[in-house]
């Protein structure tokens, strides 16, 4: 007797349910209702740097860069100070670029080093000249730069503040902000408070002092600043419409993957030359 062959029933095809992406924002983040909205601005400043000539043969000098918001709120000589209608700010990144003026690139001028320093020790290298050796060449993070070409360096500055609330009188200590807690309030009461002048450290550079004439450099410092909590009406004097020098880069709600402060690595994004 022949066996009957039964075909196995195939399991029904389960169709995956495709969920459509919501194009309408939730109620609490529409418009300006969310308080964590962050505004990114690019602010620039230019200066002339002079490297003084050496009094003796083969001497080194050093210089420093510190950064504060007040440096870029005035766009030129005798220009009005830019008023910023935000509650808090944070200097996320700074790019320093120095290029020589009127230098013959075919003649060797020597080289120096650039080193990021994030505390007040940076000021010990301010304006030193006639040094017997390069004091920055053995620092961790030092990069060589050619005096004929200049340098370009991107750093993540850090504000160092002084506190006087100690167990002993007439003494002070230093503290740093963390990356998450680095917001500095702009709108403060009192005429003696200047949050725009908080020093952010910093960059030190060394160089072989030129001979027989000094060398001149054009220096462009670019600030990448984050602001939060737009507050147009909280200023004592309403802001002027003069926004020259300010370039709005990006607005987000704080968790965006395109934010330069989270996606950019200061150690590898811009190499010194």
UniProtKB/Swiss-Prot annotation:
Keywords: Capsid protein, DNA-binding, Host nucleus, Host-virus interaction, T=1 icosahedral capsid protein, Viral attachment to host cell, Viral penetration into host cytoplasm, Viral penetration into host nucleus, Virion, Virus endocytosis by host, Virus entry into host cell. GO terms for biological process: endocytosis involved in viral entry into host cell; viral capsid assembly; viral penetration into host nucleus; virion attachment to host cell. Its main location: host cell. GO terms for molecular function: DNA binding. Pfam families: Circo_capsid. Residues 7-35 are annotated as: Nuclear localization signals. The keyword DNA-binding applies. Belongs to the circoviridae capsid protein family. Homomultimer. Assembles in the nucleus, presumably in an immature form, then migrates to the cytoplasm once assembled as mature virion. Interacts with Rep; this interaction relocates Rep into the nucleus. Self-assembles to form the virion icosahedral capsid with a T=1 symmetry. This very small capsid (17 - 22 nm in diameter) allows the virus to be very stable in the environment and resistant to some disinfectants, including detergents. Essential for the initial attachment to heparan sulfate moieties and chondroitin sulfate B of the host cell surface proteoglycans. After attachment, the virus is endocytosed and traffics to the nucleus. The capsid protein binds and transports the viral genome and Rep across the nuclear envelope. This is Probable capsid protein. The gene is Cap.
């Amino acid at each position: 007797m022949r066996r009957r062959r039964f075909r196995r029933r195939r399991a029904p095809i389960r169709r995956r349910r495709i969920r459509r992406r919501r194009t309408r924002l939730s109620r609490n983040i529409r418009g300006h209702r969310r308080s964590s909205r962050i505004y990114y601005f690019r602010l620039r400043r230019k200066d002339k740097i002079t490297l003084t000539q050496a009094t003796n043969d083969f001497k080194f000098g050093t210089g420093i860069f510190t950064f504060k918001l007040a440096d870029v709120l005035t766009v030129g000589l005798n220009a009005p100070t830019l008023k910023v209608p935000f509650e808090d700010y944070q200097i996320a990144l700074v790019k320093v670029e120095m290029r020589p003026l009127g230098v013959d690139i075919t003649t060797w001028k020597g080289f120096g080093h650039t080193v990021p320093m994030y505390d007040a020790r940076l000021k010990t290298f301010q304006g030193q000249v006639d040094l017997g050796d390069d004091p920055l060449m053995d620092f961790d993070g030092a990069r060589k730069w050619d005096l004929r070409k200049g340098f370009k360096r991107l750093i993540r500055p850090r504000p160092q503040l002084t506190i006087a609330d100690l167990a002993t009188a007439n003494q002070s200590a230093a503290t740093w902000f963390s990356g998450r807690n680095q917001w500095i309030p702009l709108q403060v009461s009192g005429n003696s408070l200047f949050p725009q002048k908080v020093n952010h450290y910093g960059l030190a550079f060394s160089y072989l002092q030129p001979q027989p004439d000094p060398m001149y450099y054009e220096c462009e410092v670019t600030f990448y600043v984050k602001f939060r909590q737009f507050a147009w009406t909280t200023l004592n004097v309403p802001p002027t419409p003069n926004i020259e020098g300010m370039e709005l880069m990006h607005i987000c709600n704080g968790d965006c993957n395109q934010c330069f402060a989270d996606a950019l690595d200061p150690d590898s994004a811009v190499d010194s030359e």
